[in-house]
UniProtKB/Swiss-Prot annotation:
It holds the Pfam family Dam. The keyword Hydrolase does not apply. GO terms for biological process: DNA restriction-modification system; methylation; viral process. It is an enzyme of class 2 (transferase). The keyword Methyltransferase applies. The gene is yfdM. One of its GO terms (molecular function) is site-specific DNA-methyltransferase (adenine-specific) activity. PROSITE patterns: N6_MTASE. This is Putative methyltransferase YfdM. Encoded by the CPS-53 (KpLE1) prophage. May be missing up to 130 C-terminal residues compared to orthologs. It comes from the Bacteria.
Protein backbone atom coordinates (compact mmCIF):
# COMPACT_ATOMS: atom_id res chain seq x y z
CA UNK A 1 0.00 0.00 0.00
CA UNK A 2 1.19 3.45 -0.80
CA UNK A 3 -0.10 5.21 2.32
CA UNK A 4 -2.10 4.76 5.53
CA UNK A 5 -5.32 6.02 3.95
CA UNK A 6 -5.18 3.43 1.16
CA UNK A 7 -4.33 0.70 3.63
CA UNK A 8 -7.32 1.69 5.78
CA UNK A 9 -9.59 1.49 2.70
CA UNK A 10 -8.44 -2.05 1.96
CA UNK A 11 -8.96 -3.09 5.57
CA UNK A 12 -12.44 -1.56 5.58
CA UNK A 13 -13.41 -3.37 2.36
CA UNK A 14 -12.24 -6.68 3.80
CA UNK A 15 -14.47 -6.41 6.87
CA UNK A 16 -17.69 -8.45 6.72
CA UNK A 17 -19.60 -5.48 8.20
CA UNK A 18 -18.93 -1.92 9.28
CA UNK A 19 -20.58 1.09 10.87
CA UNK A 20 -21.65 4.00 8.68
CA UNK A 21 -19.29 6.35 10.51
CA UNK A 22 -16.37 4.22 9.26
CA UNK A 23 -17.11 5.03 5.61
CA UNK A 24 -18.04 8.69 5.99
CA UNK A 25 -15.53 9.89 3.42
CA UNK A 26 -16.36 7.18 0.88
CA UNK A 27 -19.85 8.27 -0.08
CA UNK A 28 -20.10 9.14 -3.75
CA UNK A 29 -21.58 12.28 -5.21
CA UNK A 30 -25.28 11.68 -5.98
CA UNK A 31 -25.90 11.29 -9.71
CA UNK A 32 -28.37 14.18 -9.96
CA UNK A 33 -25.85 16.56 -8.37
CA UNK A 34 -23.03 15.31 -10.59
CA UNK A 35 -25.08 15.71 -13.79
CA UNK A 36 -26.24 19.18 -12.76
CA UNK A 37 -22.67 20.33 -12.15
CA UNK A 38 -21.56 18.57 -15.34
CA UNK A 39 -24.17 20.52 -17.31
CA UNK A 40 -22.88 23.82 -15.94
CA UNK A 41 -19.13 23.20 -15.95
CA UNK A 42 -18.44 20.05 -18.00
CA UNK A 43 -18.07 17.92 -19.83
CA UNK A 44 -16.29 16.13 -17.01
CA UNK A 45 -13.98 13.45 -18.34
CA UNK A 46 -11.60 12.83 -15.43
CA UNK A 47 -12.63 11.98 -11.85
CA UNK A 48 -9.86 13.10 -9.53
CA UNK A 49 -10.92 11.38 -6.32
CA UNK A 50 -12.38 7.88 -6.53
CA UNK A 51 -11.86 4.52 -4.93
CA UNK A 52 -12.19 2.92 -8.36
CA UNK A 53 -15.70 1.63 -7.71
CA UNK A 54 -17.45 4.98 -7.31
CA UNK A 55 -15.95 6.85 -10.29
CA UNK A 56 -18.14 9.33 -12.12
CA UNK A 57 -15.98 9.34 -15.25
CA UNK A 58 -14.39 6.59 -17.36
CA UNK A 59 -10.95 8.09 -16.65
CA UNK A 60 -10.02 8.58 -13.01
CA UNK A 61 -7.38 8.67 -10.28
CA UNK A 62 -7.73 6.41 -7.25
CA UNK A 63 -6.44 7.15 -3.76
CA UNK A 64 -3.33 5.11 -4.59
CA UNK A 65 -2.77 7.18 -7.76
CA UNK A 66 -3.00 10.39 -5.67
CA UNK A 67 -4.39 12.94 -8.11
CA UNK A 68 -2.70 15.76 -6.20
CA UNK A 69 0.70 14.37 -7.17
CA UNK A 70 -0.03 14.66 -10.92
CA UNK A 71 -0.22 17.39 -13.53
CA UNK A 72 -3.65 16.83 -15.12
CA UNK A 73 -3.24 19.26 -18.03
CA UNK A 74 -1.91 16.74 -20.59
CA UNK A 75 -4.48 14.12 -19.67
CA UNK A 76 -7.33 16.63 -19.85
CA UNK A 77 -6.09 17.85 -23.23
CA UNK A 78 -6.13 14.25 -24.50
CA UNK A 79 -9.59 13.61 -23.05
CA UNK A 80 -10.94 16.98 -24.24
CA UNK A 81 -12.85 17.91 -21.13
CA UNK A 82 -12.72 19.03 -17.53
CA UNK A 83 -11.82 17.35 -14.26
CA UNK A 84 -14.38 16.55 -11.57
CA UNK A 85 -13.29 16.53 -7.96
CA UNK A 86 -15.22 15.70 -4.81
CA UNK A 87 -12.42 14.72 -2.42
CA UNK A 88 -12.97 12.42 0.52
CA UNK A 89 -13.34 14.15 3.86
CA UNK A 90 -13.74 12.77 7.37
CA UNK A 91 -16.80 13.62 9.40
Amino acid sequence: MSNKYCQALVELRNKPAHELKEVGDQWRTPDNIFWGINTLFGPFVLDLFTDGDNAKCAAYYTAEDNALAHDWSERLAELKGAAFGNPPYPW
